[in-house]
Amino acid sequence: TFNLSIVEEFFNVVTSNDVKPVDGTVDLEAGRTERLKLFEESLLYTTEREFFDEHFCRYPVIRINFKEVSASSLGTFYKKLAASLHSTLDRWLRQLEGADLDTRAKASHQRVVEYHDSMELHLEKTAQHWELQESDAENIFVRLSNLLHDVYMSQYVVLFDEYDKPLKAIRGQPWEKAAAEMYTSLVNKIFKDNNDLKCGLLVGVYKLPLVDIGSGANCVHFLPLTVHGYHSGLNDDRGQPAVLHNSLVDMFAHDGTEVRLLVEAARGRYRRISYYSTEVIMTTLTKWYDGYAFGGTGGKFNPYAVAMFLRELEHGNVNFATQDYWQDTEN
């Protein structure tokens, strides 16, 4: 999810909500300059400059998260999918508040606002699946797609978090086939023959056969978090043990070098943290938070836990600094 946020910051256009008005004027270029600070020392900026300049802040980003999708009934499944996409639509409407739109875009925006408000009431009242059409989730996406096209006249990027959650939720249910067909239709709508789509990134815990379920998303490239030569215990599409590459192993969590940099920066900035030597802090952090392993590679630190530890240390809460922070989250 954190990595998706970085991808979103890179591709997403700057909106009026990203910039503080000065004398009633919104300077979007100033917002772009401010966002550039996030990437100025990145490898992408320093080694892939042509790509960077071509795509930075260029496309509206549609970010979808199906974390809340559950399946106690077919009706619940329809509603949760629609509600998740409605939240995505809601975020974009808020981003476009105060935007300087031309006549066509303004009319499109008003139509979508009215649709958004009516759908919000509909979702609040819906209790049974026959009150919510299975096409409602698709309709919400289409409305958002059309709006972004009218406003920006460009393609968009789709970031799809927990794409596997809906199919896992319906597995073994008596209405699994109907739900799978509905979800397949939605994936079709987003990824197949969509001329407004620049590219998409789907993230999930389990590799699911999107192509096999007939989604039409035939140009899918899998990027597994597995070290080359490491047998994950999973089988590939031919039933053979999966031996996969490691292109993303170093892209998640922190290693010891990165944590040491954070500790040294914190010691230089916060007086209470400076009471403790770098080695003392590193020993504690290593004992508590370096237990993560990706693709058979261990020694990874939990970024959230490290940040929370340093925050507690900054406030002088030495006795409470070491906790299992991650277990209290939903992730």
Regions inferred by a protein language model and the residue ranges of each:
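P-loop NTPase motor core
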Residues: 3-98
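Short secondary-structure boundary/capping segments
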Residues: 6-10, 78-81, 172-178, 207-234, ...
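Conserved P-loop NTPase "ATPase switch" module shared by AAA+ and STAND
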Residues: 152-177
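Structural recognition of the conserved hydrophobic beta-strand(s) that form the central parallel beta-sheet
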Residues: 157-161, 181, 185, 198-205
